[in-house]
């Protein structure tokens, strides 16, 4: 079994990718967005953290969090969010023998990707990645049209223009990005 080593910076800012176990076609996260939001809210009440940026796609999500000073326990937060969400779902998913033996649901991948944000440039690059993701995956043509993202918050704060990442149109023909 691989030995995963996670970077833990107390009070740090982190980028995450969290995936459903069965990715395609699966719209569980957007179909149950209110359950996901409530799961996050409940965890934030008990284990505070700031959501700097976030996008929820049908089968995975990306988030940037900043943890409180002296706190580096993002893994427990994700574990608890996944548990709350899973408990709210009807148990209809396929579960492998291993998951059955361990008493696990078959909703989430066990692990998640994390990256410690190094500086302002790294933060900005990951915010761009978060917000362009619905376009990258073909869910919308314009970033501003995806409803499950912090993009509108960034526009309201003057960080992005409303038409950010939209290709220019010349005589009705879409241009390159």
Per-segment meaning from a language model:
Residues 1-177:
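Short catalytic/metal-binding and nucleic-acid-binding patches
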């Amino acid at each position: 079994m691989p030995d995963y080593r996670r970077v833990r910076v107390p009070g740090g800012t982190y980028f995450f990718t969290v995936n459903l176990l069965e990715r395609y076609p699966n719209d569980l996260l957007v179909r149950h967005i209110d359950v996901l939001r409530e799961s996050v809210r409940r965890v934030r009440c008990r284990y505070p953290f700031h959501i700097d940026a976030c996008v929820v796609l049908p089968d995975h999500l990306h988030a940037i969090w900043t943890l409180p000073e002296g706190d580096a326990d993002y893994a427990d937060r994700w574990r608890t969010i996944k548990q709350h969400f899973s408990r709210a779902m009807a148990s209809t998913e396929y579960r492998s023998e291993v998951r059955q033996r361990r008493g696990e649901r078959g909703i989430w991948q066990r692990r998640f990707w994390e990256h410690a944000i190094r500086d302002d440039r790294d933060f900005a690059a990951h915010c761009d990645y978060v917000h362009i993701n619905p376009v990258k995956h073909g869910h919308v043509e314009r970033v501003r049209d995806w409803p499950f993202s912090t993009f509108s918050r960034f526009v309201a704060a003057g960080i992005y223009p409303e038409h950010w990442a939209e290709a220019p149109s010349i005589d009705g023909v879409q241009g390159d990005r």
